[in-house]
Amino acid sequence: VGSEMCIRDRYCTFQLKEIQDINILFQLTSAFYSEADKYRSTVEKIIETVHYHTFAVELAAKLLENGISTPGQLLAKLQEERASLDNEDKIKIIKDGQSSKATYYSHIHTLFSLYALSRKQQDIMCNLCFLPYTGISARIFTKWLELPTLNEINDLIETGFVQTTTRHTISLHPMIKEIALSETKPSVSSCHILLDSLQKICLMHGMEVAYYKKLFQTIGNIIELIEKDDIPKYLLFLENAFPYMDNYNYHKGMKLSLIHI
């Protein structure tokens, strides 16, 4: 394993891993992209262009497997983006050759933008920004968004943007969350279905939900991240969430709500 770099935000720390062995990363690509052998030299250039970052390599492989771009097209796009980055700010490259967070973010952003997600998928990504990093049940989230099936979620899992576990818990990779927040700009009006669903749960005072902690963590993220473009609706949401948090003695969320009411 090469070098690692930690990025901190107010929620967590995660590592940007670089594996300098091109063969290991080529094997990783092959696991997701069935034609990797056929385009080996181009695939290896893609791996080099994204600075050997494992998550970027995985996303690139999944993008190629989905047929959204040919290896040659993807390489050209990444090289074009890398050249513009080099011109913009050479100071951001750390002495030992590691790429900075800005460069890494840019690679992931380029891969994200190449997908041209449908309006529905963008809407789902927008709402996924509020989930706790530990994730939540895919079925519960689907119910919150009033989605008829899990199909759209499953499609996003295939892209690599949405992470999942064997227990069908879904979450966003922290870097993808950052990009989704800047691209989709979640607001009270654009996320009204999610807010209405959570509000309905909070109004059922006599009913308990097993996932209450994750519910409150989601509400906490909404408070901190959402664009408050409909103040009356937002305040009503907080006023209805507060007593439900009180039922569970969830003081952290209550304090956060009080600051914003």
Model-identified regions with their sequence ranges:
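Active-site donor-binding loop signature of nucleotide-sugar glycosyltransferases
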Residues: L16-I19, K62, E80, P174
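AAA+ P-loop ATPase catalytic core
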Residues: V43-I68
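Short, small-residue-biased leader/transition segments that mark boundaries at the very start
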Residues: V1-I7, I261
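Extended alpha-helical scaffolding segments used for macromolecular assembly and cargo binding
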Residues: S190-S257
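Helix-loop-helix "sensor" segment of P-loop NTPases
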Residues: R10-V50
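Short, compositionally biased segments
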Residues: D9, L256-I259
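C-terminal boundary/linker of central alpha/beta nucleotide-binding cores
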Residues: V57-E65, H109-T184, C191-D196
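Loop-to-helix "switch" segment enriched in basic
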Residues: L25, L63-Q121
